[in-house]
Amino acid sequence: RFLYLSMRHPLTILFGYVTVFLFGMVILPFLNSPRKNFDSIPAFLLHGTIAVWLVIYFGWLGLVLTLLLPFFIASAIGSYLFYAQHNFPGVILKAKKGWTYEGAALESSSYLKTNPVMAWFTANIGYHHIHHINHLVPFYRLPELYRDVPELRQARTTSLHPLEVLRCLRLKVWCVETQRMVGVQGL
């Protein structure tokens, strides 16, 4: 329970470079299955080597400005985008009875409204629900598909508006009784 809630804590999302990338995508997968995730070692060593090289040649400030800060910002944004597209007001989660693949894509993953610049920077990640319906659709075709298939416009939505971000970050667990996501206080 503690681990589940800590994974959904805003600080875990903010420090996504360490929590999501290094620990969640590099270290933990390797520890769980070394043969399957052998590529974690080169990734970890590459990051470490680049960090040491930057400190030697450019000092600590060089490390912070060229590696840590950009990775910190990108990982925090990426971690939040993933979180918000699965934990948002109006999300619907169903047990096996009543669950369908398409229903889960449209009701349990969101359409994240973004401006054209953010859509470009994130490779149209806002169309996440379409990705869950068919992951083979290239990112550059997602807006076209969204426009041309009316059913895809019925997905639950969220945005990067500060109030919407706060609403998403407050949601932690699915309440079976009320059939909605709630914060820790709602337990």
Regions inferred by a protein language model and the residue ranges of each:
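A generic short-segment signal for beta-strand/edge and adjacent turn/coil regions
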Residues: 96-99, 114, 138-143
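Internal amphipathic alpha-helical segments of the cytochrome P450 catalytic fold
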Residues: 73-74, 127, 142
